[in-house]
Curated annotation (Swiss-Prot):
Disulfide bonds join 11-70, 25-117, 27-43, 42-98, 49-91, 59-84, 77-89. This is Neutral phospholipase A2 3. Expressed by the venom gland. It catalyses: a 1,2-diacyl-sn-glycero-3-phosphocholine + H2O = a 1-acyl-sn-glycero-3-phosphocholine + a fatty acid + H(+). It comes from Bungarus fasciatus (Banded krait). The lineage of its organism: Eukaryota, Metazoa, Chordata, Craniata, Vertebrata. Ca(2+) binds at residues 26, 28, 30, 47.
Length: 120
Protein backbone atom coordinates (compact mmCIF):
# COMPACT_ATOMS: atom_id res chain seq x y z
CA UNK A 1 0.00 0.00 0.00
CA UNK A 2 1.08 3.62 -0.25
CA UNK A 3 2.20 3.81 3.40
CA UNK A 4 4.48 0.81 2.89
CA UNK A 5 5.76 2.28 -0.38
CA UNK A 6 6.68 5.49 1.49
CA UNK A 7 8.66 3.42 3.99
CA UNK A 8 10.40 1.48 1.21
CA UNK A 9 11.43 4.76 -0.46
CA UNK A 10 12.96 5.96 2.80
CA UNK A 11 14.66 2.60 3.39
CA UNK A 12 16.31 2.45 -0.05
CA UNK A 13 17.33 6.08 -0.41
CA UNK A 14 18.26 9.25 1.41
CA UNK A 15 15.48 11.59 0.24
CA UNK A 16 12.10 12.02 1.89
CA UNK A 17 9.13 10.42 0.12
CA UNK A 18 7.60 13.92 -0.10
CA UNK A 19 10.26 14.84 -2.68
CA UNK A 20 8.59 12.40 -5.07
CA UNK A 21 4.93 13.35 -4.58
CA UNK A 22 4.90 16.10 -7.23
CA UNK A 23 7.94 15.34 -9.36
CA UNK A 24 7.96 15.29 -13.15
CA UNK A 25 4.98 14.02 -15.13
CA UNK A 26 4.45 10.66 -13.39
CA UNK A 27 5.53 10.91 -9.74
CA UNK A 28 2.42 11.42 -7.65
CA UNK A 29 -1.20 11.10 -8.73
CA UNK A 30 -1.82 10.29 -12.38
CA UNK A 31 0.58 10.87 -15.22
CA UNK A 32 0.70 11.76 -18.89
CA UNK A 33 3.08 12.62 -21.68
CA UNK A 34 6.76 11.78 -21.83
CA UNK A 35 8.73 11.33 -18.60
CA UNK A 36 11.08 14.29 -18.07
CA UNK A 37 14.07 12.28 -16.81
CA UNK A 38 15.29 8.98 -15.36
CA UNK A 39 13.52 9.48 -12.02
CA UNK A 40 10.24 10.31 -13.73
CA UNK A 41 10.65 7.12 -15.81
CA UNK A 42 10.92 5.19 -12.52
CA UNK A 43 7.52 6.64 -11.58
CA UNK A 44 5.97 5.76 -14.94
CA UNK A 45 7.19 2.16 -14.63
CA UNK A 46 5.70 2.08 -11.11
CA UNK A 47 2.36 3.44 -12.38
CA UNK A 48 2.34 0.82 -15.15
CA UNK A 49 3.19 -1.90 -12.63
CA UNK A 50 0.21 -0.90 -10.46
CA UNK A 51 -1.92 -1.00 -13.60
CA UNK A 52 -0.77 -4.58 -14.20
CA UNK A 53 -1.47 -5.45 -10.54
CA UNK A 54 -5.06 -4.30 -10.97
CA UNK A 55 -5.53 -7.06 -13.57
CA UNK A 56 -5.21 -9.62 -10.75
CA UNK A 57 -8.74 -10.27 -9.43
CA UNK A 58 -9.59 -8.12 -6.38
CA UNK A 59 -6.05 -6.68 -6.29
CA UNK A 60 -6.03 -3.05 -5.15
CA UNK A 61 -2.40 -1.84 -5.15
CA UNK A 62 -3.01 1.45 -3.33
CA UNK A 63 -4.56 -0.31 -0.31
CA UNK A 64 -3.30 -3.92 -0.23
CA UNK A 65 -0.74 -4.61 2.50
CA UNK A 66 2.22 -6.92 2.00
CA UNK A 67 5.12 -8.32 4.00
CA UNK A 68 8.66 -7.09 3.42
CA UNK A 69 11.95 -6.52 5.21
CA UNK A 70 14.21 -3.50 5.14
CA UNK A 71 17.72 -4.05 6.40
CA UNK A 72 20.55 -1.58 5.81
CA UNK A 73 18.90 -0.23 2.68
CA UNK A 74 18.18 -3.68 1.24
CA UNK A 75 14.52 -4.40 0.48
CA UNK A 76 13.16 -7.94 0.37
CA UNK A 77 9.58 -9.02 -0.28
CA UNK A 78 8.68 -11.95 1.97
CA UNK A 79 7.61 -15.34 0.67
CA UNK A 80 4.33 -15.37 2.66
CA UNK A 81 2.67 -12.75 0.40
CA UNK A 82 -0.27 -13.90 -1.71
CA UNK A 83 -0.15 -13.32 -5.49
CA UNK A 84 -1.50 -9.77 -5.31
CA UNK A 85 0.65 -8.73 -2.33
CA UNK A 86 3.79 -10.23 -3.90
CA UNK A 87 3.15 -8.37 -7.15
CA UNK A 88 2.58 -5.01 -5.43
CA UNK A 89 5.53 -5.50 -3.09
CA UNK A 90 7.78 -6.07 -6.09
CA UNK A 91 6.37 -2.98 -7.87
CA UNK A 92 7.19 -0.87 -4.80
CA UNK A 93 10.60 -2.50 -4.19
CA UNK A 94 11.76 -1.98 -7.79
CA UNK A 95 10.52 1.64 -7.76
CA UNK A 96 12.18 2.47 -4.43
CA UNK A 97 15.50 1.09 -5.69
CA UNK A 98 15.05 2.98 -8.98
CA UNK A 99 14.34 6.23 -7.09
CA UNK A 100 17.47 5.78 -4.97
CA UNK A 101 19.64 5.31 -8.06
CA UNK A 102 18.22 8.13 -10.18
CA UNK A 103 19.52 11.71 -10.14
CA UNK A 104 17.11 14.23 -8.59
CA UNK A 105 16.62 17.48 -10.51
CA UNK A 106 15.05 20.21 -8.36
CA UNK A 107 13.81 21.89 -11.56
CA UNK A 108 11.48 18.92 -12.16
CA UNK A 109 9.74 19.22 -8.77
CA UNK A 110 6.23 20.70 -9.04
CA UNK A 111 6.52 21.42 -12.76
CA UNK A 112 3.60 22.78 -14.76
CA UNK A 113 2.21 19.48 -16.00
CA UNK A 114 -0.22 21.19 -18.40
CA UNK A 115 2.64 22.57 -20.48
CA UNK A 116 5.39 19.99 -19.86
CA UNK A 117 3.52 16.68 -19.74
CA UNK A 118 1.32 16.66 -22.82
CA UNK A 119 2.44 14.72 -25.85
CA UNK A 120 2.16 16.77 -29.01
Amino acid sequence: NLFQFKNMIQCAGTRSWTDYVSYGCYCGKGGSGTPVDQLDRCCKVHDDCYGDAEKIPKCKPYYKTYSYDCSEGKLTCKADNDECAAFICNCDRVAAICFAGAPYNDNNFMIDSKTRCNDI
